[in-house]
UniProtKB/Swiss-Prot annotation:
Annotated organism of origin: Caenorhabditis elegans
Family statement: Belongs to the cuticular collagen family.
Tissue: Syncytial dorsal and ventral epidermis.
Entry's Gene Ontology molecular function annotations: structural constituent of cuticle
Name the record gives this protein: Cuticle collagen 2
Signal peptide: 1-37
Transferase found in the keyword field: no
Alphabetized Pfam families for the sequence: Col_cuticle_N
Region (Triple-helical region): 105-134, 153-176, 183-212, 215-282
Biased composition (Gly residues): 201-218, 262-274
Matches recorded under PANTHER family: COLLAGEN, CUTICLE COLLAGEN 2
Organismal lineage: Eukaryota, Metazoa, Ecdysozoa, Nematoda, Chromadorea
């Protein structure tokens, strides 16, 4: 009996081990593809986010360069905002023009997105920076001169004729007519059919001799063929009219080359001196949990 019990126990242990092994292998076959798929999706998402950040950074840099390269003189201070001329960079505002006031044209169609670039190599660590300077007072805001309104353009051509309107409502009924009299006589009826031929009459007597008379001119004949072309006529008198009306406005020309940089402005006034910085303190000791204790009794993490 003891041997049978041991055999049953060994069989139970063997079956249990085989069962757990099969379950473990099946679990590995199921979980490995799921983990691989999850990691692949996370990798794709991170790659997409990195490309989006690169494209956004590239767009921001391009806009910064456009703003930096935009023509204009922004070095004037408030006292020069309303000047009408002068030497250096201040002379551009005295022409009375309105080049910067007109609205720009509609934006062009967006270009196709470029291919993502290859990731660059990590740069070398930079050298430690110099100690910062004290804060300077904010610059006085520059008041921009008001723009002169552009003159109104000529009236446009007349539009096409509109569609016909809907039919109007029915009119009111007319007043009743009075008693009518007899109408006018109708037109004569058509001629009746020809009658039968009559009996031949008796022969007549000899007639009187006819008088010879000269007939009048006949009707004019048809027009003959056109004759040869005559010699060229003399030049006409010069016209008295003025020049014709101006033609339509042509298409806008290509963008011109950027103008030369203006003369540098004068040096600005010195700013107010900044306040004194806080007194530096050294940490007294550092705690194990990351806190730092200073001599004044404060603690920072």
């Amino acid at each position: 009996m003891d041997i049978d019990a041991r055999i049953k126990a060994y069989k139970f242990v063997a079956y249990s081990a085989v069962t757990f092994s099969v379950v473990a292998v099946v679990s590995v076959f199921i979980t490995l593809p799921m983990v691989y798929n999850y990691v692949n999706n996370v990798k794709k998402q991170i790659h997409t986010d990195v490309n989006f950040c690169k494209v956004s950074a590239r767009d921001i840099w391009s806009e910064v360069h456009l703003i930096k390269d935009a023509p204009g003189n922004n070095t004037r201070v408030a006292r020069q905002a309303y000047s009408t001329g002068g030497a250096g960079g201040g002379g551009g505002g005295g022409g009375g023009g309105c080049d910067g006031c007109c609205n720009p044209g509609p934006p062009g169609p967006g270009g196709s997105p470029g291919k993502p670039g290859k990731p660059g190599k990590p740069g070398a660590p930079g050298a430690p920076g110099n100690p910062g300077k004290g804060a300077s007072a904010p610059c006085e805001p520059v008041t921009q001169p008001p723009c002169q309104p552009c003159p109104g353009g000529p009236p446009g051509p007349a539009g096409p004729a509109g569609p016909p309107g809907p039919p109007g409502p029915d009119g009111n009924p007319g007043s009743p007519a009075g008693p009518s009299g007899p109408g006018p006589a109708g037109p004569p009826g058509p001629a009746g059919p020809a009658g039968n031929d009559g009996a031949p009459g008796a022969p007549g007597g000899p007639g009187e001799p006819g008088a010879s008379e000269q007939g009048g001119p006949g009707e004019p004949g048809p027009a003959g063929p056109p004759g040869p072309a005559g010699p060229a006529g003399n030049d006409g008198a010069p016209g008295t009219g003025g020049p014709g009306p101006a033609g339509p406005k042509g298409p806008p020309g290509a963008a011109g080359a950027p103008g030369a940089d203006g003369n540098p402005g004068g040096p600005g006034t010195a700013g107010k001196p900044g306040g004194e910085g806080e007194k530096g303190i050294c940490p007294k000791y550092c705690a194990i949990d990351g806190g730092v204790f200073f001599e004044d009794g404060t603690r920072r993490r």
